[in-house]
């Protein structure tokens, strides 16, 4: 009996004060996206597994909860990431010829937590641009991501930039690397140079030296010039570094770091990647980048770039106060009071009628005004 109310590990209820804050930030961000011209879409919570994982990497498969559809007998997946679903909508349902801007907000479910104490039910919100291959789309998405963090009240943001094209160019001449690929990615992400040195034994000197240099290419924008001097002078690497320099130059409201070994999502991304951190905290608060290859898996190759964040994580960091301003009203059968309350609520005001015998029901609200009888009418006065 005592464990009936227990929830699965890393799953938690959202209580009123947190829910109010999350909803306030969700509305602010969606309103922000709308001012940029982004259209809201609402993909389903579950899909056939093969559709849900189309064009994604092995990591998303591991994070996806599976179940059997009792109607069709086919395997379903509960979404662990909304981004591929939005790419499917753009490629398969909308089928527009030009630029499309889409945004979304909804719960996702992870089979395994992404980190220590991480929730398995994030509330993901994000925005995507389809149809433009130029860096201008990446600049807009990067700007929108930083603006979303600002409307949440977060400040002192650091933006880390990377580019999937650099590693792709280094690995293009190394087909044998596929055998150690996962271990190599893990060593690069953790900047474990000794492990990377051991893994890359036997590789050609040029590529091995470049791979060993990636974890050291971390710091301010001056890292880009260090990378030009350190990495092979291939056209692909040169273009990638040029794009990073151009993207960094567009940032005015955050500090910029270059981290050429921050390769989380490498199999998914195809160009620039950016990650936002709040100063002093180890975990990122938002991630984005270019992923041109995903739409191709749905039968329509489209340039694409976007970002996403977890509203629950951002709400926990946000200083935004959302204790609602409300109007107190007594419990009274007077029709004039009912009319006054109905009119106020129709105008968007929160009006709380105190039920007889209860004194603590207003604690979650700031009732700075009250309805008071004046003659035959009820009027709002300071409380």
Curated annotation (Swiss-Prot):
The keyword ATP-binding does not apply. GO terms for biological process: histidyl-tRNA aminoacylation; L-histidine biosynthetic process. Heteromultimer composed of HisG and HisZ subunits. It is found in: Cytoplasm. Belongs to the class-II aminoacyl-tRNA synthetase family. HisZ subfamily. It comes from Cupriavidus metallidurans (strain ATCC 43123 / DSM 2839 / NBRC 102507 / CH34) (Ralstonia metallidurans). This is ATP phosphoribosyltransferase regulatory subunit. Disulfide bonds: none annotated. Keywords: Amino-acid biosynthesis, Cytoplasm, Histidine biosynthesis. It comes from the Bacteria. The gene is hisZ.
